[in-house]
Amino acid sequence: MVKVNGFSFVARSAGIRKSGKPDLGLIFSTVPARCAGVFTTNKVQAAPVLVTAPRIAAGECQAVLVNSGNANACTGEVGMQDALRCGQLAAKSLGIDEQLVAVSSTGVIGHPLPMPLLEKTIPGMSEGLSETAVDDVANAMMTTDSFAKVASRQAGDSAPYTILGVAKGAGMIHPNMATMLSFVMTDACVDQHFLQQALRQAVEGSFNIITVDRDTSTNDMVLVLANGESKTPEIVADSAEGQEFAELLRGVLLDLAKMIVRDGEGATKLVHVCVNGAADDGDARKVAYNVATSNLVKTAFFGEDANWGRIIAAVGYSEAQVDPSRIAIFFDGVPVVQKGLGTGPELEAQATDVLKQAEFSVTIDLGLGDGRGEYYTSDLTYEYVKINADYRT
Amino acid sequence: MVKVNGFSFVARSAGIRKSGKPDLGLIFSTVPARCAGVFTTNKVQAAPVLVTAPRIAAGECQAVLVNSGNANACTGEVGMQDALRCGQLAAKSLGIDEQLVAVSSTGVIGHPLPMPLLEKTIPGMSEGLSETAVDDVANAMMTTDSFAKVASRQAGDSAPYTILGVAKGAGMIHPNMATMLSFVMTDACVDQHFLQQALRQAVEGSFNIITVDRDTSTNDMVLVLANGESKTPEIVADSAEGQEFAELLRGVLLDLAKMIVRDGEGATKLVHVCVNGAADDGDARKVAYNVATSNLVKTAFFGEDANWGRIIAAVGYSEAQVDPSRIAIFFDGVPVVQKGLGTGPELEAQATDVLKQAEFSVTIDLGLGDGRGEYYTSDLTYEYVKINADYRT
């Protein structure tokens, strides 16, 4: 069980979810932590986002309260009051300033929070705090997730610290609106400005290669809290330590991001789409995005069909510079297309074996330049349709 | 049975499709027709597109040969030779110049056409031409389509002519790469330049509101042939007759486009997404597109769930100007959101009844300006996944 100095956790079943599953989690740091956040770019923002974003921008945070079962989105002024009230209840229970509490919600949109349940449950939560209960919080954040998502990294012996993250999210097929929440705790001491910069960068190389900025839900939120309780020297930008911290942070977020794809609603496969040889990185990313989000490509993955025709067509309708006669496509190492033409039935049969795996890569070489981009995606399955057709009913 | 003066049709089972279904169609005009075309914008273009586009641009066409079962795409130089050869065979059989033959293909990508079958079948086709066999051609164009798509309009008594169209296409869920073909025959006499302009406009208001430019397959093609055999006066731009022709042409294409959505792979519902009150038409179209292509919205339609939360979130992540507190959403006439807030369980129950219908509209009013846009979409179902996972195997 990974612990992080100064952090403790607790979860409860408040009854927001009718199933009676845990639906309320609390993360607490014994001292105020420096913090950074990345929030949804959706123009429709849920009340907890509106309440929390300015608090994080102020630079210090000591607790995160998260509920599942209700997004507190599209709930108007009542929703704002409810989000503030939840923060107050947590602050009072913990004996801290309410401005140091981040609040976060995920679940159905358009229904007010069941405040009587929260009024009853939040006040007693601080009593249950435990430094080993991070899994409970990860569990309480779940909506259609099929497993709790926790990842961590440790820094080396000379100045040891830990980065521990939890996340929630599963609807990444086309990533519209499937709320993604992630909270990262570290006992490192990190310069505030660098912390925000490192988080932004880490999100770009993790959550943003399973989703894209515009495809955000009303509630998306990634927070990092650095409380300095490792008592190691302050980590600043443009240093070896800063570089190491940034890499470890990205490692935690990428682990969580891959778990989200693997847990994509109904998904049975994790596919790494890599694009090389593009005119530039932007082009590479566009191509990777188009391939990774094509329903026809994703259903072919589910059908374990090495259908490179669908891939090459998705490459072609991207806005990237493309010369069809230079395209090469590989499933893991197996070339199925060279110079824009199929390589024949024998290699296609080998590629079909690759597709039978639970994890594989599709590499597309455009043969034009040095641009690179990547994306993680899953297959599109019967189960996806079932989950999303039945979600509210 | 709608007939168009001077046009005749024939279809055959050449054996390209292993099922033995008809897979080869021929459309013939007794005289060379003025023509116009809209072709895929995909950077990867199939051989028949490369062969046909310049012929149509030359302004005259007398025959269209179409096959299903094989797209002749990503087939390199061999594919080009095969496409040219098919045109030659048809031209010879019909006794016309090969430059007057358009060729078109749909089906799997990356396999050469089975030329021996085509060499054997095409030469005898002209013998079977019949002016009442348009349905046979529509039938021979089908791939995953579940029904043949034919629509027509007649112009008024003073100068009567007919517009008759066929189309193929069914994979419009996210419209990536699902080839869309349409051929329109009219005996009107139409100015060549105006014909191209009217076609472009009609496509914008029909096929392009079920798909978008970038989401084109390697093979997409819409052709119109106007042979003048109605012997009515030439129709030119900026005239009442031109206006009428443009409207009738759009009517035919919109009928065909709706059939394509209704036949969307596995689709059970046809949904008209209307956006009003946007800052401008471009914004309205962006919002309509985002809502119409959201997998989560579409699975909610399948689940007959009036889940306006998913709709409002899709509105929010569009790039359009949005003020959440002004959004209104209606299912047919039933308001489920006013000023960004839900209207309560009673109206939501009424909306759920609307969703039980096979056809309904979702109207989104952004409350900002006069911008309008629309889109037709379908639901996302188990059957979609099944069809696309199994398509090649």
Swiss-Prot record, chains A, B:
Record keywords: Acyltransferase, Amino-acid biosynthesis, Arginine biosynthesis, Autocatalytic cleavage, Cytoplasm, Multifunctional enzyme, Transferase
Keyword Cytoplasm appears in the UniProt entry: yes
Domain of life: Bacteria
Cellular localization per UniProt: Cytoplasm
Site (Cleavage): 178-179
SUPFAM superfamilies for this protein: DmpA/ArgJ-like
Nucleotide-binding listed as a keyword: no
The enzyme's E.C. designation: 2.3.1.35, 2.3.1.1
One GO cellular component, as annotated: cytoplasm
Transmembrane intervals: none
GO MF, one annotated term: L-glutamate N-acetyltransferase activity
Biological or metabolic pathway of the protein: Amino-acid biosynthesis; L-arginine biosynthesis; L-ornithine and N-acetyl-L-glutamate from L-glutamate and N(2)-acetyl-L-ornithine (cyclic): step 1/1; Amino-acid biosynthesis; L-arginine biosynthesis; N(2)-acetyl-L-ornithine from L-glutamate: step 1/4
Family: Belongs to the ArgJ family.
Name this protein carries in UniProt: Arginine biosynthesis bifunctional protein ArgJ
Gene: argJ
